[in-house]
Amino acid sequence: MAVAADRLQELPARSERVLRHAGIDRLFHWLTAACVLVLMATGLLPHVGVQFDWTGIHWVTGLALVVLVVFHLLRSLVWRRLRAMWFSLAELRTHQVGKYSVAQKLMHHAMTLMVLSAVVTGLLMLKKIRTPLLLRDPYVFSAHTWGVIYVIHGLAALAAITLVIVHVYFGLIPDNRMYLRAMITGWMSRGDQRARVTGIRAGEKHLT
């Protein structure tokens, strides 16, 4: 009981904290993370000798990711949230600080590009397997076109894996733990918020 009381005292009071991520944003983030991890496992493990019936898991999870991506894009367009992810040259020169730093915005854009590339090519690749959704037709594209599709899909997946590793690394280092807490609880203390602004203006890296 004493330990629980101490932990409660460590939590910032409501007046001493700011909302960084709404519940719907946190849910989207963790569902997307789960889909990406499953896709990584089902896509890579068979290539290192771990054999299992991965095809069904892979394409179903891929479709779940498509739903999440479409939801994210529609929500961004309807609520005009896309503007928050763009930056100008003036922002680079003056280190202006909004909700996200330039590094965080660049990470978001890079991950978005890789995920969209993997999603589009993955949807095309559904024509090569048997699913209840599409009639299998592996001859819809030429062998050369299929080769290009597979290369783009593989490179996008490898790039996404690299970005995930970088994202997790920067999320776990002590200076960035406030971002991890905010993605779990939704809140950031005002002290952490001030430290974040000071750190970004000083040129520190925040890639979570």
Where do the PLM segments sit?
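Membrane-embedded alpha-helical bundles that constitute the cytochrome b-like, heme-associated redox core
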Residues: 1-208
